[in-house]
């Protein structure tokens, strides 16, 4: 009898629905490159989001708005390759960048297809409420699963007046609930709820058949998602209220690089153990080499093309 555990089942849109029905929590994180994807997959995440949050976490922008569709395709393809190095279990979702789906349904379908065909994503995520119902229907009819995203939608940061909690009063809470129902009806297979009151997230989750993935939405969602850089503690100066830092990698990286710099300055690195050796290397005096070089014809290094 084999002692190896059975391979873990790939998490697709149907498995996510089953997890909701079974009461199994969904663990999702962001990743932006192959190395991060390989590591989070090995850690056992159920889903990976190639978020346009890379604009802030990787590119150094103040918002997600400058991120382009080409960049999303590029990073998604890297993450797909990283996941392929593991057991291939995690579900891969890519964000649709600002401007890639708002102008027309036709453009949205083309953008979604690129993220799947070129970026290797299994699904796309887009922000917005009922007003994007027709766009979602078109993308789904084209064969691309869509994850919705309501509450705080970072691509609408200027309209919302900043990164603030949404749905705190009765009227806005009702609108979020209406949007959630509309997105489910439009064909979304899952829904991200960002920065809304925990009580509202519980109501939305209980009234939908599709899974809800919370970020800053309390413990009642069917799953949770965090930006990898935040949960790893890579930036000690930025820790939103809803983020729990599960590591302090920022300090660890600074310490490791600082140790490297110190050893280089002290000529302690590289030492003998980190150097290559050969007893058969033929040493040529520098002076002799220079003389031989002067005797070579001018075209010895190759004629210009």
From Swiss-Prot:
Name of the protein in its database record: 3-methyl-2-oxobutanoate hydroxymethyltransferase
A Pfam family it matches: Pantoate_transf
CDD domains xref list: KPHMT-like
Gene: panB
Assembly and interaction partners: Homodecamer; pentamer of dimers.
Binding site for Mg(2+): 52, 95, 127
The record's free-text note on cofactor binding: Binds 1 Mg(2+) ion per subunit.
A GO molecular-function annotation: 3-methyl-2-oxobutanoate hydroxymethyltransferase activity
């Amino acid at each position: 009898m084999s002692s190896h555990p059975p391979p873990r089942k790939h998490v697709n849109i149907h498995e996510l629905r089953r997890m909701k029905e079974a009461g199994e929590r969904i663990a999702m994180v962001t990743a932006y490159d192959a190395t991060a994807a390989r590591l989070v997959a090995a850690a056992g995440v159920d889903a990976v989001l190639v978020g346009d949050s890379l604009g802030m976490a990787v590119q150094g922008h103040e918002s997600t708005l400058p991120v382009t569709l080409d960049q999303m395709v590029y990073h998604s393809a890297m993450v797909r390759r990283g996941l392929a190095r593991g057991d291939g279990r995690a579900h891969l979702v890519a964000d649709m960048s600002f401007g890639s789906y708002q102008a027309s349904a036709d453009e949205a379908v083309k953008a979604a297809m690129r993220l799947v065909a070129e970026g290797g994503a299994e699904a796309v995520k887009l922000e917005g409420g009922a007003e994007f119902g027709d766009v979602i229907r078109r993308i789904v009819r084209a064969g691309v699963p869509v994850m919705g995203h309501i509450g705080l939608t970072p691509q609408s940061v200027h309209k919302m007046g900043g990164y603030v909690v949404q749905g705190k009063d009765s009227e806005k809470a009702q609108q979020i609930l209406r949007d959630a129902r509309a997105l489910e009806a439009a064909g979304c297979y899952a829904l991200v709820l960002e920065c809304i009151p925990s009580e509202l997230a519980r109501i939305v989750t209980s009234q939908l058949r599709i899974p809800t993935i919370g970020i800053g939405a309390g413990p009642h969602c069917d799953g949770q998602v965090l930006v990898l850089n935040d949960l790893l503690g890579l930036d000690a100066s930025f820790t939103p209220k809803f983020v729990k830092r599960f590591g302090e990698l920022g300090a660890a990286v600074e310490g490791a690089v600082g140790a490297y710099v110190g050893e280089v300055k002290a000529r302690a690195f590289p030492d003998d153990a980190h150097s290559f050796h050969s007893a058969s290397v033929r040493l040529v005096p520098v002076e002799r080499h220079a003389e031989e070089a002067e005797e070579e014809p001018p075209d010895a290094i190759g004629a210009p093309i």
